[in-house]
Structures are given as structure tokens and as C-alpha cells.
UniProtKB/Swiss-Prot annotation:
Gene, per the UniProt record: rpl16
Name this polypeptide is given: Large ribosomal subunit protein uL16c
Lineage: Eukaryota, Cryptophyceae, Pyrenomonadales, Pyrenomonadaceae, Rhodomonas
UniProt-recorded Gene Ontology molecular function terms: rRNA binding; structural constituent of ribosome
Record-linked SUPFAM superfamilies: Ribosomal protein L16p/L10e
Subcellular location, record wording: Plastid, Chloroplast
GO cellular component: chloroplast; mitochondrial large ribosomal subunit
Assembly notes: Part of the 50S ribosomal subunit.
Annotated PANTHER family: 50S/60S RIBOSOMAL PROTEIN L16, LARGE RIBOSOMAL SUBUNIT PROTEIN UL16M
Swiss-Prot/TrEMBL GO biological process terms: mitochondrial translation
């Protein structure tokens, strides 16, 4: 699972989603990409499951770039705990995704293989996604 080695603060505020992605919304590394169409907190487990799905589908040919990183900790209180007594301990890590953000890029494979790999991988994600290519960007 992806997680930061160290952070400035252990327990960040929850925040909220406003607007669309102004950064990370262009294809930089590969030829084809998977783009988010909805706002979401992507967990490190979801990112890893999607990565494994794509690499297995393309049979480890080409190159895959992960364009998101889970750098926000989500805290959780233990079950059957009374309210109060401070904020819970960090439980898992998420990446904050806005609409239009590029999640994954792939290169060195055909367009049909990349499309099918990303279509298969999108079932691992809790949001609607779109397949885009560099030539039509």
C-alpha cells in the first residue's frame, strides 16, 4: 500500500471538494490515461487494486504511471467508544481527487489494449472515469 514516510501533521482536517482539478489534468508521461469525472477520496487499497488490475491485464508490457498519491490520513475511533476523548487514531490514507484529475497513465501498448485495461480497472474505483488519449487532448 502507498503511504507517506512522514507528514507535517498527523491528523489533517477533512476539508471539502470544490471545483475541478487545475493541476494534474493533462497527460504528461504516457499516451493514454484514466481521468476522474467525480470528486472522491481514493484509498491506498483502491489505488493498489487498480494498479494490479491494469498490470495483469496488459501482462506487464508497456509502462504504467500512477499520478495520484495518498497523502491525507483519515482517523477513526474504535468501535463502541463513547464520544469525546479526542480525535481517533489515523486509520488509513487517501488521495484527494477532484473532477478532471488524471489517475493513471500508460504507454508502450496499443490503444485497444489500453482502453480495455482501463475499462477493467475502472470497476475497482468508486467513481465514474473516462479514457483519454494524448493525441485528442
Amino acid at each position: 500500500m502507498l503511504s507517506p514516510k512522514r507528514t507535517k501533521f498527523r491528523k489533517p482536517h477533512r476539508g471539502r471538494f470544490r471545483g475541478t482539478a487545475t493541476r494534474g489534468n493533462k497527460i504528461v508521461f504516457g499516451e493514454y490515461a484514466l481521468q476522474a469525472l467525480e470528486p472522491v477520496w481514493l484509498t491506498s487499497r483502491q489505488i493498489e487494486a487498480t494498479r494490479r488490475s491494469v498490470t495483469r491485464f496488459v501482462k506487464r508490457t508497456g509502462k504504467l504511471w500512477i499520478r495520484v498519491f495518498p497523502d491525507k490520513s483519515i482517523s477513526c475511533k474504535p468501535p463502541e467508544t463513547r464520544m469525546g476523548a479526542g480525535k481517533g487514531a489515523p486509520d488509513y490514507w487517501v488521495a484527494v481527487i477532484k473532477p478532471g484529475h488524471i489517475l493513471f497513465e500508460i504507454g508502450g501498448v496499443s490503444e485497444t489494449l489500453a482502453y480495455n485495461a482501463f475499462k477493467n480497472a475502472s470497476y475497482k474505483l468508486p467513481i465514474k472515469t473516462k479514457f483519454i488519449s494524448k493525441e485528442f487532448q
